[in-house]
Amino acid sequence: VNETLPNGVAPWHQASYAAFLREHLPALLARRLPLNAYSVEQSGGRARIELDVDTTHLVVEAVPWPDAEGVFHLDGRELVVLPVADDRELDKATVRCVGEQLYEFVEPRVGEGPSGMVWTDELLASWLPIGRWILDFLEPSEGGGTVQPVDNLNWLARIEHLRRLRIEHVRAPGARPGEDERVELPGQMGRVCPIMKPEGPNFPIIHSIARGAVIRDGRIEAMDDSPDMLLSVTAAAIPFLNCDDANRALMGANMMRQWLPPAEPQAAFVLAGTEPDVPDLWCGRNLLTAFVSWGLDTFEDGLVISASCAECFGLSQPLEPGDKLSNRHGTKGVVSRILPDDEMPRLADGTPVDLVFSFIGLHTRMNFGQLKEAVLGRVAHRRGEGMVAPAFDGPDDEALKQTLRENGLPETGMEVLRDGRDGSPLERPSTVGYVYWGVTRHRPRTKVHAHPGGPANRQGELEYYALRDLGASALIGETFGLRSLRTEGSPLANPDRIDYPLPQPQGLTPVFTDLQARLRDLGVAAELQNDALAFSEAECPDGLELALPMPHPWLPERMIRSVGRRADWPEFRALEQANEHIRRVVAQHAPEQLTGRARRTLAARLAEYAKALLPPDAMRFGEPVAFSARAVIAPLDSLDVSQIGLPEDMAWALFGPLLPDRDEESLDLLMAESWVIANRAPSLGATSLLAFHPVRVPGAVIRLNVSTCRLLNADFDGDQLAVFLPLTAEGHREAGELLSVEAHVRRDASILNQLCPNHEALWGLAWLGLTPEGRRQADAQFPESLLPTTGLLDATTIAQAVQTVRERHGLPTALETIERLTRLGLEATRKSGASLNPFAGTSTPQPQCPDPLTVSCWFEQADDLADQILCRGDYDSLDIGPQLLAVKAGVRGSVEQLLAGLVGAVIVDSESNLLYIPHGRLRGYTPNEVFVHTVGAHRGLWQVIAQCEQLGQQARSRHQPQGYHVLARAMRSRCPGTVFARAAARAELDPLTDVDAKLFIGLAGS
């Protein structure tokens, strides 16, 4: 560890805390009190403070003390306090570690002792509850505070957590969301890792301290600028990092921290050379990996593993479908199928592979380091010793080929695999080798939930918009009314048996009754009168009487005398305390100065209570819904597009209460006649809600037909799906008529294109179309001959032919045709053995320019280079044939991505300067090229994250009510309370002509 981290794991935590207790705290006390003596004694994980104020002695026992790594051990918990930088330009930033943060916490609490005060033991102990202050500070808070439980999942998770840094101010002045903000800056280089960051909204906020950096005296200093010392511990442990796209390397590093530790560690065959000699570091297994398609089971990141592989990790439970695996290069997927060893594809010598991952996305994700690792891993396995490939200095292609030759292995890194089921060879050589994989903490048994009652999955505002736009008013009433678990005493909270189907709800929605109660707490009445909503001012007789009449927080020109009680709300408790304080002040006839201060405090607490009482979200649908379930998804070949596979336990949980007895035949019959609604958040389009007929399947994952993935924006890398069961006859009818796959296509015929074969299925059809026999085979899947006799069978050609089937033969026939085409294409891809050559690019054109090549020269030739690639038709080439076919058939990727991966590219640095890279990512970038590329890659990733954050707001703006009556205005307002208070003051009547207002109240049927 000392060699990996020459400055120590994280010495700044303990140093900062020691400085607080030994220097800064006594200095503070000396300024506020007559401090005569102060000392600290530390032993193990505790310290003892002794101090004298005037002539009074105080001893503080059992004060927490962090260990050498900066970890506090309290009541069986391990806690760490993240350092915080006040500027994203870290070379200029002040960094506050635990000691500085604790000082800020304690300083306002230390009162100044008045001159002449007589100190007693009791007074001093109550004046300076130092031990309690420190314990209060060290209590983790919700919402991303700096005090956090240590992530002890594995060794890397722990080390990286202790070496984490938080940046407070991340937006550049004047920057728009996602624009020139939260990206790498020059002052961060050498101080934090440019690769390793969170993948969500904390992307620019949380950083991993570089191996060569240290926090000292309130600054973060770069002590070593050698390339591998600029990385975090985890990123530096990725071999061939310079062959990976920066965002994929980010994913790889993050997922290594999520790997479950096996019973027995196994070191990787291919090392980066920076790994410490710590057995607990190794959480994965070296798996013989084939980068080929294996039909439907490897579609959209699905994994096929062998039975031996399922057992080899030594976890408490063997792997099963739904388990998520990842490697160090950012490839991830869930197990879709576990095959007997003798059914797996096998090497020429009969060795079965352990894991199959599809080649189809490799040229677009550009995490080519895994291919190089596979090649070198075979050498390491052959030699029986580890091989080293540093992050920035792994062996080049010629060295790898020579090593392969010297060890009796194919110098291409590829060989023809055989199908384990019948021994037949695949049609072309495939890349295969040993790659280090780990199992993430996201195990399927922990992710599957099924709730006939509570706790339940939530349906929110976006789901409401989708249902509203489809005209599913009955489902809205059922989802946000009948099946809402917000209503106290709901009969569906703990249902053992229900009379199915239930009647359609007729009462008010829980969200509206909740709104009425909230408004009443601040003196506004909202009552239905003859299908209209009347607003008026009202008293709150059972509420908290205010000590003084106060301006209404929503309508300052009106006075309020009482508020509703919500004793469990912190905002109400604070208001109650402020009210009691001013009551005492007034009763004691205190000076106006004190009375005015107390009045201002009461007004502030009242405003905070009002804000908490009616935030904008209170005007939006969002309910925990009974009879809901959730699980990880995986593909299944026996399902058609109208079906979804529910795990056995989930099926019984949802449908069991609808049956008089636990009878499997009755269950299957009921499921076959029923619809369930599948939903994958965020619900940004109509097809994010799909109705399926459910069938029982073994295991702990929800199974999908692969053709529906694009409709749900889902893939098989760990995505989860929520499932909801309608309980009313009308809701059930709407599910089938409005939300089924057929219903969506009948409403919008273009949706059929999204169901057409894609990814490996489309590649396989294009591959078949290269020969007359294969083309005839594809054409035979149609009810009549529709495919052209020449030209590439690309996405457009297939989609047009399928649309013709719909027009001539009807939608059911078109869907059946898609099923046949998808199965044919997937099988063709599986048999092809198509892969990505680890040394691809030897046949690609190179720019013809003087040396050194300039940016302008590259731009002059880029279009010509792209044209040269697109003019090629050698799809059976061992060099880039499969990737060329994927691009030209519209399967995946672009010619620009082929150029970037194989030829060269122009990238943008942190100062927006252009830099030409004269070789493809597959060859490996120099350290400087990696760091420059990372800036642009992360900027793009942050823009995507920022856009995702804005999608909900954009959807709200697009779908919000357009009316001008009270409810519609309040739904649009950032302060709905003001809208309601003014309506009450004017005694307004909302006629409820707006559809959103009627649905919100529960009058959809009116």
Q: What would you call each of these model-derived segments?
A:
Residues 286-290, 294-296, 301, 324-325, ...:
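OB-fold/S1-family RNA-binding modules
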Residues 77, 94, 98, 188, ...:
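Helical mechanochemical/support elements of P-loop NTPase systems and associated helical scaffolds
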Residues 91-101, 116, 280-286, 294-297, ...:
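Core catalytic machinery and nucleic-acid-binding channels of phosphodiester-processing enzymes
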